[in-house]
Amino acid sequence: MTSASELFSTRRSRPGRSDPALESDTSSYRHHSHHHHRRHGVHHHNQRHDSDGCDPLRRPTPRLRRFFHHPIQERSRPIRDVQGTSQYLNTDSTDTETQSSSFVNLNGSERLPGAVLLARDRLFERLRGVSLSSNSRSNRVSLDDQRESSFHSIDGDPIFQLAGLQVTYECNKKPQGLTQDAINCLHRQTFSSAEVKSEMRDCSICLESFTKGDMLISLPCTHSFHSSCLNPWLRACGDCPCCRRAIAKE
């Protein structure tokens, strides 16, 4: 025990000198460690060489490396425009701009002054009135055209032509008016309730009832009228006002 303690104290008292056994152990450890790192480095280099040379699909692109080395760009996304160039835009800023633009588009009309809104409403009303008036005018023109075409078709119908000719003939065929002498030759009588039938007690010209003492004119068709009412009619037309029977001239 004494020799061991002396040896230990002796080694501690000489810091500048090293133990050959310890140096050999340290050198062997360093050599083993250097050899291990070298082999590991060669193996890692071979793996990189194999990954870069043999499998091109596993080779990371420079863009991905740039993303890996710069984490601040992970929030950016590439946007390819029409010409094919790549542009990196920030996602947060793009979303914010989109929301702001949509907000402006939605609230653009609400931000207009009141006078502008009123003017726009008046313009819309005028345009609507112009469109309605043009539509009504076109409809009116189409109705007029239809009426004219219907009238032309009626005029061209032979049946209506014959009817018109018949009416014209009847009008032209009416008897001429009577002279005053012919009127004076008609049968006259004084009204008496006992002599006249009940259904013939009204004048069909003035629509008044006969009274006792009225002077009446009785035509050949047995219709009786006030003489004052029938005289103008007979001077204009020589037929009965009720049945349109011609009065024979004597």
Swiss-Prot record:
Q: Which UniProt keywords apply?
A: Metal-binding, Transferase, Ubl conjugation pathway, Zinc, Zinc-finger
PANTHER family attached here? Answer: RING ZINC FINGER-CONTAINING PROTEIN, SI:CH211-59O9.10
Instruction: List the molecular function annotations (GO) for this entry.
Output: transferase activity; zinc ion binding
Transmembrane segments annotated in the record for this chain: none
Catalysed reaction per UniProt?
S-ubiquitinyl-[E2 ubiquitin-conjugating enzyme]-L-cysteine + [acceptor protein]-L-lysine = [E2 ubiquitin-conjugating enzyme]-L-cysteine + N(6)-ubiquitinyl-[acceptor protein]-L-lysine
What InterPro entries would the database entry show?
Answer: RING_finger_E3_ligase, Znf_RING, Znf_RING/FYVE/PHD
Query: Where in the chain are the RING-type zinc fingers?
Result: 203-244
**Ranges of Basic residues compositional bias?**
29-47, 60-69
What EC identifiers does the entry list? Answer: 2.3.2.27
Source organism superkingdom: Eukaryota
Q: What class of enzyme is it?
A: transferase
Protein name in UniProt: Probable E3 ubiquitin-protein ligase RHY1A
CDD domains given in the database record: RING-H2_PA-TM-RING
Question: Source species, please?
Answer: Arabidopsis thaliana (Mouse-ear cress)
What the protein does comes down to: Probable E3 ubiquitin-protein ligase that may possess E3 ubiquitin ligase activity in vitro.
Q: Which pathway or pathways does this protein act in?
A: Protein modification; protein ubiquitination
Q: Where do Low complexity bias regions lie?
A: 91-102
Query: Disordered: where is this region?
Result: 1-106
**GO biological process entries:** protein ubiquitination
Give a yes or no for keyword Transcription regulation in this entry.
no
Where does this protein have compositionally biased stretches of type Polar residues?
A: 1-10
Q: Which PROSITE patterns match?
A: ZF_RING_2
Q: Where is the composition biased (Basic and acidic residues)?
A: 48-58, 71-80
